[in-house]
């Protein structure tokens, strides 16, 4: 299950890369449940030797996400990613909620976590999240189960790194492992290059100046302008496992009806 990479912009000069995995087995099981057939057969073929029928239930089919699928996925979970970075990784929530979860255990996000993120605030009722549960996998690793149009498992590989990231976003003074964040990996968006046409230098020998009166065709090169804007790449902090993808709605063009005379 090779991942595909998508990036989500979480600040003016910062992008969060997401490694997106497709859980093929889970998607096939979900399709069987939605079709109301527990033993749904995908392919049937007769066997010529004894006229029996071969049924294949799990063919070796590659399931992948298109660029439009990844864009729709990132657009849907962007608000929840910002909620994870800015609120869930706060020191108060880590110490009072996340650290209380034992390794291998889960808790309801909507009941036990979301109300504490905005406790005492006037906008707590206006905040919506589609994260259903939080499971602690290791000391700093957590799994968030997300279900809306997409059904996902969002893996936080290190809540400690996200807490440091939140500190940088809030106060612009973050260091990672003793190095400045500006020394970390960056994403190159574009750069600016300008080339001016150059006139070749001609050497005159033995008084042949009259032979050089003919016009010289200059190799004029176009001026190409680019803009360079450095963006900080945060590395592999969050992984997304796709469990269910919404159906693609095909746009069908309606046939033109004949105009009434």
Curated annotation (Swiss-Prot):
GO terms under cellular component: endonuclease complex; nucleus
GO MF annotations, alphabetized: 3'-flap-structured DNA binding; 5'-flap-structured DNA binding; bubble DNA binding; Y-form DNA binding
Keyword tags: DNA damage, DNA repair, Nucleus
Lineage top rank: taxon: Eukaryota
Keyword Transcription regulation: no
Keyword DNA damage assigned: yes
Main location: nucleus
Disruption phenotype: Accumulates recombination intermediates blocked at the RAD1/RAD10-dependent 3' flap cleavage step. Abolishes association of RAD1 at single-strand annealing (SSA) intermediates. Insensitive to MMS, HU, or phleomycin treatment. Doesn't sensitize cells to UV lesions. Substantially increases the rDNA recombination rate.
InterPro entries hit by this protein: Saw1
Self-association state and partner proteins as the record states: Interacts with MSH2, MSH3, RAD1, RAD10, RAD51 and RAD52.
Anything else known: Present with 1170 molecules/cell in log phase SD medium.
Protein's job: Catalyzes 3'-non-homologous tail removal of RAD1/RAD10-dependent single-strand annealing recombination intermediates. Plays a key role in targeting RAD1/RAD10 complex to 3'-flap cleavage substrate in recombination. Also contributes to the integrity of ribosomal DNA arrays.
Protein's name according to its UniProt entry: Single-strand annealing weakened protein 1
Gene name as annotated: SAW1
């Amino acid at each position: 299950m090779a991942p595909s990479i998508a990036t989500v912009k979480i600040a003016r000069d910062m992008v969060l890369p997401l490694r997106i995995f497709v859980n093929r087995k889970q998607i096939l099981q979900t399709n069987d449940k939605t079709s109301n057939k527990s033993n749904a057969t995908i392919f049937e073929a007769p066997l010529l030797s004894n006229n029996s029928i071969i049924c294949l239930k799990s063919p070796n089919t590659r399931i992948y996400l298109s660029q439009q699928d990844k864009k729709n996925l990132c657009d849907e979970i962007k608000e929840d990613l910002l909620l994870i970075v800015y609120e869930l990784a706060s020191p108060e929530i880590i110490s009072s909620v996340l650290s209380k979860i034992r390794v291998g255990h889960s808790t309801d996000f909507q009941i036990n976590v979301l109300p504490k993120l905005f406790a005492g605030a006037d906008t707590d009722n206006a905040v919506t999240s589609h994260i259903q549960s939080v499971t602690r996998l290791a000391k700093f690793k957590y799994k968030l189960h997300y279900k809306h149009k997409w059904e996902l498992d969002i893996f936080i590989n290190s809540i400690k790194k996200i807490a440091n990231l939140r500190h940088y976003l809030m106060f612009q003074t973050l260091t990672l492992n003793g190095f400045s964040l500006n020394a970390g990996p960056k994403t190159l968006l574009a750069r600016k290059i300008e080339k001016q046409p150059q006139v070749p230098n001609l050497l005159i020998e033995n008084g042949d100046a009259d032979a050089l009166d003919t016009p010289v065709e200059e190799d004029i090169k176009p001026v190409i302008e680019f803009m360079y804007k450095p963006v900080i790449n945060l590395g592999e902090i969050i992984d997304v496992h796709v469990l269910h993808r919404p159906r693609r709605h095909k746009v069908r063009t309606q046939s033109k009806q004949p105009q009434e005379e």
